[in-house]
Curated annotation (Swiss-Prot):
This is LexA repressor. The active site is at S156, K194. Signal peptide: none annotated. Represses a number of genes involved in the response to DNA damage (SOS response), including recA and lexA. In the presence of single-stranded DNA, RecA interacts with LexA causing an autocatalytic cleavage which disrupts the DNA-binding part of LexA, leading to derepression of the SOS regulon and eventually DNA repair. NCBIfam families: lexA. Residues 26-46 bind DNA. It holds the Pfam family Peptidase_S24.
Length: 235
């Protein structure tokens, strides 16, 4: 049995994974549960991990995956059966393992997403014409629109569960809402993956790592090139 706070945190993490493809930061968890400090979040996460509901990736800061949800039946909270993590695992690009009888059909329906390079300073997305390879992604992971993948380099987003070496799945988009994690092109030179927020007339590009500073820029220096919709990770 989970306590109310444990269930609320598990539900919040799961919903954020489904919506954004990455887990919330500890500060976001603290605010969502109306706790005064992050130490309470640490205790709740430890309890959820001990009970087998989540997994923290070893040697990776605050990278969390939901392993299962409680079978709540008619209880409040709307638990779902058959849950699997939102992060795509391994090299097959499966979000949820298909039943044996439908395995081949599921594989045939997967979408080949082009890997357009690395998300690092120096190269605008449009200039990356050579596609190194593709990754196979379930169509329900993508939704509508045009998509591409970028290899993440660096640790500036680790507290959002985005790790060095991950493949970021990006939906092409020229606009963003506050809180979205976006591919932003700065001064037509530097591409970066950061959380987008508006601060008055300016744009804030926020890292998810206390070692990095928030960048505050005027809108004419920032061009949105896509929004993060998920991650492809090899183990």
């Amino acid at each position: 049995m989970l306590t109310r706070k444990q269930f609320e945190l598990l539900k919040f993490i799961n919903e954020r994974l489904k919506e954004a493809g990455v887990p919330p930061s500890f500060d976001e968890m603290k605010d969502a549960l109306d706790l005064r400090s992050k130490s309470g979040i640490h205790r709740l996460i430890t309890a959820l991990e001990e009970r087998g509901f989540i997994r923290r990736l070893p040697n990776r800061a605050r990278a969390i995956e939901v392993i299962k949800l409680p079978d709540l039946g008619g209880n409040t909270g709307g638990g779902r059966r058959g849950f699997t993590p939102s992060v795509i695992e391994g090299t097959l690009g499966k979000v949820r393992p298909p039943s044996h009888s439908h395995a081949e059909d599921e594989s045939d329906r997967n979408v080949a997403v082009p890997v357009m390079g690395r998300i690092a300073a120096g190269t605008p997305i449009e200039a990356l014409q050579t596609r190194s390879h593709t990754i196979s992604v379930p169509p329900d992971m993508l939704g509508s629109g045009e998509h591409y993948a970028l290899e993440v380099r660096g640790d500036s987003m680790v507290e959002a569960g985005i790790l060095d070496g991950d493949m970021a799945l990006i939906q092409r988009n020229e606009s963003a809402e506050t809180g979205d994690i976006v591919v932003a092109l700065i001064d037509e030179e530097e591409a970066t993956l950061k959380r987008f927020r508006r601060r008055g007339a300016s744009i804030a590009l926020e890292p998810a790592n206390a070692a990095y500073e928030v960048r505050i820029l005027p809108p004419n220096r920032v061009r949105i090139q896509g929004k993060l919709i998920g991650l492809y990770r090899k183990y």
